[in-house]
Amino acid sequence: MDVKTLKGFKDYLPKDSLIRIHIVKQIFSVLNSYNFDLIDTPVLEYSELLLKKSGDESEKQIYRFKDHGGRDVSMRFDLTIPFARFVATNISDLKFPFRRSQFGKVFRGENSQKGRYREFMQFDFDIVGEDGFRADAEILSVVYYGLEEIFLNFIEGINKKFIIHYSHLGILNSFFEKLGIKEESIFILRNIDKIDKIGIDKVKEALLLKIEKEAVDSILSLVNLQGAFKDKIQALKSILGDNESVKRVEDVYRHLSLLKIQDSFNLNLKISGGLDYYTGIVFESEVFGSNMGSVCSGGRYDNLVSSYSSSIQKVSGVGGSFGVDRIKDIIDLEQFSYIKIFVTKARSKVLIVNLDSALQNYYYELATRFRNHDYSKVKNISCEVYFKNKNGKNIKEQIEYALNKEIRFLVFVGQEEYKENKIKVRDLTKKEELLLSFEEVINVIKCNEKLLCTPF
């Protein structure tokens, strides 16, 4: 029997899972600060629903089959289309504007490689029921603060590790209309989106199959606008005149400037979202030096929800998706090893060393006190008792176990400590050992949470 995993699918060992949880927790903390509400949707949906707005590329990659009841079903390839179905299904129970967050696995039958899998986790966030520019800007600010939290850019001395590219499909569509080729807009956008992947020459070659050379040259010149934001806006105004989409981009930029985060954003007209349901702002996020593609992308989709129900009026939406597993692969790169140090040191885990067979019950009572010392459960300490007791003759074995699990604190209680109601605690990162009361041990562990601010 072949016991290896399928191509594009993988197991996650504890250390890998720890990094994934770090990513999810950091994103969740940001979304929670913005009042996003967590939801969930099924992994399986009717194929007709998923294929309706997926685009040709996604249709080729979808896992589709007949279930035991003969129904044509597919595994979700993203979380956005199932969310649009969710809104259409539950619209009477939702209060708009609705801020949604959701994380879960999605499935795509694409060529697997580093940073690209057939099963992977996404963390999505959306605002539906609001079509103003501030909703666009708020989504972009979530991307910024989410990546800042993940890559610890809030710590002094750690430089920004990412750039967020954004565009507006209305700008491109206005230009196509001016050139008299609006009917080919989907074809053009799909190819423009591939410029950074396959190169401008191959994209030009593909565009020339349907578009005149003069128009192709004009398009490629537009999407390669260079300079500062104000220079690009000035160029767009000279080409398109008074244009609503250009004004929208200006308004979004002003909002980002209000937050003093505008320097992490780049107006990049090569970005088109890659999916047919986008209608306005679109964005992708790049981590410097990773060469793994976008780690968070999304955009505005004003017609998606209403396409699933004839009784629903237009429900505007804008959102994005963090690629949890791709971000995890980037953190595996050597230049991001500081994050692993941070995550490991931030875990105040305890191992109670099993020294004395006569103190077995006490050890488990003590472990319960560590786990439950904080009534809110928020700041409780992860703790376990080493199972095997050899009356102190296997201490080396227990320390090796702690090191392997990256447990930071060892607790020793022998007969002498027990009689004095004291605990001996050893910090494995400092090779430091102290004899303390239970309350003092808690304080020592909690004081070491300062490492959350200085992980080195």
UniProtKB/Swiss-Prot annotation:
One of its GO terms (cellular component) is cytoplasm. It is an enzyme of class 6 (ligase). InterPro entries: aa-tRNA-synth_II (IPR006195), aa-tRNA-synth_II/BPL/LPL (IPR045864), Anticodon-bd (IPR004154), Anticodon-bd_dom_sf (IPR036621), His-tRNA-ligase (IPR015807), HisRS-like_core (IPR041715), HisRS/HisZ (IPR004516), HisRS_anticodon (IPR033656). GO terms for molecular function: ATP binding; histidine-tRNA ligase activity. Pfam families: HGTP_anticodon, tRNA-synt_His. GO terms for biological process: histidyl-tRNA aminoacylation. Belongs to the class-II aminoacyl-tRNA synthetase family. Homodimer. HAMAP family: His_tRNA_synth. This is Histidine--tRNA ligase.
